[in-house]
Regions:
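Surface-exposed recognition segments
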Residues: 8-11, 28-125
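Short, small/polar residue-rich loop motifs at catalytic or cofactor-binding pockets
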Residues: 18-21
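Short, charged, amphipathic alpha-helices and their helix-cap/turn boundaries
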Residues: 1-9
Length: 125
């Protein structure tokens, strides 16, 4: 169901390499970390009130959140709640564009993105 350190040849794998989860989705954990629009702050959770619904984190920042673990992680690190941060400047070092892109991370092959969609109106959440 996941691509991680014990079943990857130290690189990403095609979606066909894993089985779908009960929702029919693949690669929700492992393979690549997912780039999120939330800004990263190491203390973001400690500043939230208990019971917060869909917390957004800080309004500004310098690095974004990445989640879910990657192909070189141990199984214990592959969780939806696993949270790290981008390393923007380091990941752009060999970007050939001038000026540098704010989105294209040519040096990091272990980050993807999460597709988010709303369920149809009237369905159970």
């Amino acid at each position: 169901y996941v691509v991680y350190v014990k079943n990857s040849p130290n690189r990403t794998q095609e979606p066909s390499a894993v089985l779908p989860n009960p929702f029919g989705l693949k690669n929700m954990l492992g393979n690549v970390m997912e780039y999120c629009s939330d800004w990263y702050a190491p203390d973001a959770y400690s500043k939230m009130q208990d019971g917060a619904v869909d917390p957004k984190g800080p309004e500004t920042g310098t690095e974004h959140v990445v989640r879910g673990g990657q192909f070189s992680d141990d199984a214990a690190d592959l969780r939806s709640a696993a949270r790290g941060q981008t390393e923007h400047d380091a990941w752009l070092k060999t970007d050939p564009q001038d000026p540098k892109s704010i989105w294209w991370y040519s040096d990091i092959r272990s980050v993807g993105f999460r597709v988010v969609c709303e369920p149809p109106e009237g369905t159970v959440r």
